[in-house]
């Protein structure tokens, strides 16, 4: 149990909430995009919370935005600046996701198993959800 009177308590509480803060920052950025994404979520070690200081942060973005590549690159850079970790932001259109689901690509299993939804709906993963 945390002694909230301890001088280090605010720092401990801040460290404990880093995962939520990252999700909040990602949400704030993508909510400013002119075309709202269908789905944005953390997956991999960032979602499972079993990564370390060297782990990358995996983010899935599903959108019809024609500027998808630029949005993904910009978000990856922001995440790197916020965390110090490399970000692997995977941008896919809904059609891409449907094709990956039909092909039973292994990454789809990881998404359905680990994904923490930040924005949108898990149903954007189609039949894999």
Describe the function of each predicted region.
Residues 1-38, 48-54, 63-129:
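Catalytic core of pol beta-like nucleotidyltransferases
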Residues 41, 60:
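Phosphate-binding active sites in nucleotide-utilizing proteins
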Residues 56-58:
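Acidic active-site catalytic centers that drive phospho-/nucleotidyl reactions
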Residues 44:
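Active-site glycine-centered loops adjacent to acidic/histidine catalytic or metal-binding residues
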